[in-house]
C-alpha cells in the first residue's frame, strides 16, 4: 500500500515491511525491526497448551494482515487452514481480544494486554525469540527535501534506533 502511494506521488515518505522487490523509483533505508508475539485470548484452546507446534495451529483460526489493496503481505503467511483477514493491526487485536482466533501482533501493541491478563502469549515451539519483521523507510528517489521532510526522515531512523 505504501509503495503504491509513493509510486503515485501521494506520499513523500512512508514506512513499510521490507520487501525484496525494490521499486526503481524508491529510495529505501532499513530502519529496524518490529518484534511480534503470537497471541490469543486467555480462554482460547491454544492458550491452555504448554507448547504449541505448527501442526497444532492448523485447526485454529488465524487472523492475518492484508494490504488495503487486498494483497497478502509476504511477511505474514498463513499457518492455519482457517484464516480471517484484516488490513489493520488494531482490528486484528480487537478480534483476538474477542476470542475470534489467534494472531501475530506487534509486541508494543499487546504487552499491556498480556500483562493485564486480557491476552495470552502463545508458546510456539518455532519462536525461540519474538519473531521480528524488518521495516524500511521509503522515499522517492531524487525528490526535493525541505527542512520538515529532512527532519522527519532522520527522526524516523532515530526512533527505531532508540527502540533497539
Label each residue range with its predicted role.
Residues 1-23:
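Central regulatory/effector-binding core of bacterial HTH transcription factors
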Residues 14, 82, 141-142:
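Glycine-centered flexibility motif
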Residues 21, 25-100, 105-130, 150, ...:
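C-terminal regulatory
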Amino acid at each position: 500500500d505504501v509503495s503504491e502511494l509513493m509510486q503515485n506521488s501521494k506520499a513523500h515518505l512512508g514506512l513499510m515491511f521490507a520487501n525484496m522487490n525494490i521499486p526503481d523509483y524508491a529510495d529505501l533505508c532499513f530502519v529496524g525491526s518490529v518484534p511480534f508475539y503470537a497471541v490469543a485470548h486467555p480462554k482460547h484452546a491454544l492458550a491452555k497448551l504448554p507448547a504449541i507446534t505448527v501442526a497444532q495451529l492448523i485447526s485454529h483460526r488465524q487472523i492475518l494482515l492484508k494490504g488495503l489493496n487486498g494483497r497478502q503481505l509476504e511477511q505474514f503467511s498463513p499457518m492455519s487452514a482457517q484464516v480471517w483477514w484484516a488490513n489493520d493491526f488494531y482490528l486484528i487485536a480487537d478480534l483476538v481480544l474477542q476470542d475470534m482466533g489467534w494472531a501475530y501482533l506487534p509486541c508494543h501493541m499487546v504487552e499491556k494486554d498480556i500483562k493485564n491478563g486480557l491476552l495470552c502469549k502463545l508458546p510456539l515451539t518455532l519462536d525461540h525469540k519474538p519473531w521480528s519483521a524488518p521495516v524500511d523507510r521509503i522515499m522517492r528517489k531524487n525528490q526535493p527535501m525541505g527542512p520538515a521532510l529532512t527532519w522527519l526522515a532522520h527522526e524516523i531512523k532515530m526512533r527505531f534506533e532508540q527502540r533497539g
